[in-house]
């Protein structure tokens, strides 16, 4: 803001920062303590408005404090000084959102600024500044060419005399200057976020900061945004193909070249249209149900995204004893790759497999590590799979060739999660939200926390409900496999139809080249014919169908009564789990209450009799016998 437009306030010394308030929370312990649900962690990022560069970040957990603070230097918020003539030429014009503060001040004489010049940044210690929010109600205050500060009425925070260093959403203050002033460490600031639970932080809030200096008030803009923080390790794929870890979102070419000519124009076969039962929404519904049981706060407002490229599934480790039997596995492992395996699990290992050099060394529970025997077969328990280096299977023989490792897992769809505001940013037009955020795989780490640490307990039956939801989701994956089998059937029928068309074309070509001895002679081939081997596909698909039906029957026969209770009506399940605790306490009181009451009454009677005897002894003298 220039001096010709308005009269700026008089300069005074900066107002000292407010003292830090210490809030003590006292938790009262009762005889019965409610089970508390775990709160998710969040990361608050302080970034550049124009480039998205991260200046500072801090971690915050809901319920721990009502404020989030950043420690950052004033010069960190400004861009790096231009070093070359080309960089100077590419600098944005003054007011274009970010300016070269070092070039703006020039570092000549006693002038100050940010950069490597000696004493330049130290001179900023006596310079005031002011801030304007990017979401000001007045539309004229949202001008990025003036750093959201085209007028003094737009200012909400300021360090000069009479200005406020605190607003309803943000406060900023200087901290004591360091004794040793080095580059980007001369003007430390404390930026505090108020009400971190507010939904507006998901979208990100931006401010413009301008220095109160003679002439043009140079400035910069920054953004503070809240993101769900999930700790997760690098994926550990297992299967025949382990190099398919493409990102969930990729740019596709705008145009596709379709100029490749077709050799023959053949009539399209008239296939009967077949409809598959849609399973994607049911899979996402199962994931959200499980997420709602284990992490209800995250499930309140979120977007679930399925991965569009293989591998489509991930595994959650299961610690259980594998069933052994005679060599009776009739199907070989399917060539499906599990994108990641999380948690601890039971493992099968064959001779020659180097587990110490494998990423699954920490995954395999040493007490449940089994060496594969060539005389038996191993079968996964109900609702689980064996994710092997050769593929995915329910049963595996000990005679499988080559070094082999199998991990017992629950197979789950590879799902990515966005918070509600971030998901809306994802589908918004690019001109509204130019900066997209990379998806974070959330499902597997949360489920690993459920099975290892029990961090998802939200009530007395939360763990049982979480296990029930996990089994339900695993069953949904089986249904998805069934749909894949139906899709293979349709593709098989299409291949059969295409084969018929090809044979018809071959007959026509044989007639056309009859004078040359037929098509094979014209092409110079000694033998050319089509061998239809689709019967093998049909037989394999039939076995897959039989295995799915058999596992479904075993699952229905082995459901415990306490798990079947959670398949009832939701309100009835909630009522039963809510009344179970009080009813159990009442039953124990009726059984042991009379005994405890009689013991207490006898104790009281004994104490009363002892007091009476003591009182009587004080009223009389003891007679001495001669």
Curated annotation (Swiss-Prot):
The record marks 438-439 as: Ancestral cleavage site. A motif (CX6CC) lies at residues 520-528. Residues 39-438 are annotated as: Surface protein. The CKS-17 immunosuppressive domain is present in many retroviral envelope proteins. As a synthetic peptide, it inhibits immune function in vitro and in vivo. It is a single-pass membrane protein. A motif (CKS-17) lies at residues 503-519. The chain crosses the membrane at residues 576-596. Keywords: Cell membrane, Disulfide bond, ERV, Membrane, Signal, Transmembrane, Transmembrane helix, Transposable element. It comes from Homo sapiens. Residues 439-626 are annotated as: Transmembrane protein. A motif (CXXC) lies at residues 302-305. It comes from the Eukaryota. Residues 1-38 form the signal peptide. This is Endogenous retrovirus group S71 member 1 Env polyprotein. Residues 597-626 are cytoplasmic. Expressed at higher level in thyroid. Expressed at lower level in adrenal, bone marrow, brain, breast, kidney, ovary, placenta, prostate, skin, testis and trachea. Belongs to the gamma type-C retroviral envelope protein family. HERV class-I T env subfamily. It is found in: Cell membrane. Residues 39-575 are extracellular. The CXXC motif is highly conserved across a broad range of retroviral envelope proteins. It is thought to participate in the formation of a labile disulfide bond possibly with the CX6CC motif present in the transmembrane domain. Disulfide bonds join 520-527. The gene is ERVS71-1. Residues 439-459 are annotated as: Fusion peptide. One of its GO terms (cellular component) is plasma membrane. CDD domains: HTLV-1-like_HR1-HR2 (cd09851). InterPro entries: FMuLV_rcpt-bd (IPR008981), TLV/ENV_coat_polyprotein (IPR018154). Retroviral envelope proteins mediate receptor recognition and membrane fusion during early infection. Endogenous envelope proteins may have kept, lost or modified their original function during evolution. This endogenous envelope protein has lost its original fusogenic properties.
